[in-house]
């Protein structure tokens, strides 16, 4: 591979970053995958697979491993960031001085900025300035299924139409990976954060043993909370009926591949928060997202009762069953009401 002709540099060699890199390479593109741990990257290069997360998926020949950040960023103008939301800003500040002058950045990170609850677009603009084209991809994607080439669909939104068109062409594969463009940059970002919170609630409900009726009601009312918050931020309502909204919400709330759902199930079964996190053994994005989404809702005056009760369980020591009973005991409402 020529040093500067890769189609994409992927920042983040976890399960999802690796799966996206594999998908791009499988589409015939030269891809560079960077990870912060040189030993981990050396192991990936030796094994030609990510044995820790995706042991049965060999790397295509066009997937190249790199532990030197400057070299990775020099390889392509297109940068795909796939890191946990709580380090998103830190990573962007790290890569900014090393990016090519023609660089364009897209992220698959789902969540909001830690502590502030800001959208990641605001974090990116603060870190990178106003000139770099930005984009986000989001939707119902489990890394193992994506890497295995099973049919998957996502949404793509960008501040730059040319970048959006180029990304759609790069990522889209008619055999297994559909990429839908969406002009709603805010909505596509927000859906991925809120669904993590609701998935914890769905897991709690199932952990308690409330059954399918309760789970479905929680998903539906969770979608209403997502839509209300989105409207307050200026998102398009239709976005939340698409891949980045309802699609990702249903997937994360109903399948045990979801760490957020499994985490919630443990809480519903009586496990404490710290023990549940330790048992999951990987980042549970919804834990931080709950605090951030709640902060955002308060800032914009949006009532989100499910989010509030999940927050009470995660951060205030409330029992999951008590939280569920609080929700069930709320005053009668019109289903179409704003609270």
From Swiss-Prot:
Active site, per annotation: 195 (proton acceptor)
GO CC terms in record: cytosol
Enzyme class: oxidoreductase
GO MF term (any one): NAD binding
EC number per UniProt: 1.1.1.94
Main localisation: cytoplasm
Entry binding sites for sn-glycerol 3-phosphate: 110, 139, 141, 195, 248, 258-260
Keywords: Cytoplasm, Lipid biosynthesis, Lipid metabolism, NAD, NADP, Nucleotide-binding, Oxidoreductase, Phospholipid biosynthesis, Phospholipid metabolism
Catalytic activity from the UniProt record: sn-glycerol 3-phosphate + NAD(+) = dihydroxyacetone phosphate + NADH + H(+); sn-glycerol 3-phosphate + NADP(+) = dihydroxyacetone phosphate + NADPH + H(+)
Name of this protein: Glycerol-3-phosphate dehydrogenase [NAD(P)+]
Organism the protein comes from: Shigella boydii serotype 18 (strain CDC 3083-94 / BS512)
Gene: gpsA
């Amino acid at each position: 591979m020529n040093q500067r002709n890769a189609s994409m540099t992927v920042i983040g060699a976890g399960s999802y970053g690796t799966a996206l890199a594999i998908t791009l390479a499988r589409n015939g593109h030269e891809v560079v995958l960077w990870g912060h741990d040189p030993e981990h990257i050396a192991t990936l290069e030796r094994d030609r697979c990510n044995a820790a997360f995706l042991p049965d998926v060999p790397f295509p020949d066009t997937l190249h491993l790199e532990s030197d950040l400057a070299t990775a960023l020099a390889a392509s103008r297109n940068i795909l960031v796939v890191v946990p939301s709580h380090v998103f800003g830190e990573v962007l500040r790290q890569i900014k001085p090393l990016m090519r002058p023609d660089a364009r950045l897209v992220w698959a990170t789902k969540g909001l900025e830690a502590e502030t609850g800001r959208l990641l677009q605001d974090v990116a603009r603060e870190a990178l300035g106003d000139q770099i084209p930005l984009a986000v991809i989001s939707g119902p994607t489990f890394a193992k299924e994506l890497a295995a080439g099973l049919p998957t669909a996502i949404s793509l939104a960008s501040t730059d139409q040319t970048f959006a068109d180029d990304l759609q062409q790069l990522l889209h594969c008619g055999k297994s990976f559909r990429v839908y463009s969406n002009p709603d940059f805010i909505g596509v970002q927000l859906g991925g954060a809120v669904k993590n919170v609701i998935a914890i609630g769905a897991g709690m409900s199932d952990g308690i043993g409330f059954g399918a009726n309760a789970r479905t009601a929680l998903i539906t009312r969770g979608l209403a909370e997502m839509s209300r918050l989105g409207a307050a931020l200026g998102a398009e309502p239709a976005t939340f009926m698409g891949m980045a909204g309802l699609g990702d919400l249903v997937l994360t709330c109903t399948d045990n591949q979801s760490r957020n759902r499994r985490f919630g199930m443990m809480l519903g079964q009586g496990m404490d928060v710290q023990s549940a996190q330790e048992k999951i053994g990987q980042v549970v994005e919804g834990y931080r997202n709950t605090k951030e989404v709640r902060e955002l809702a308060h800032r914009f005056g949006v009532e989100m009762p499910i989010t509030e009760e999940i927050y009470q369980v995660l951060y205030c020591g409330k029992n999951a069953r008590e939280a569920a009973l609080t929700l069930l005991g709320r005053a009668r409402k019109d289903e179409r009401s704003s609270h």
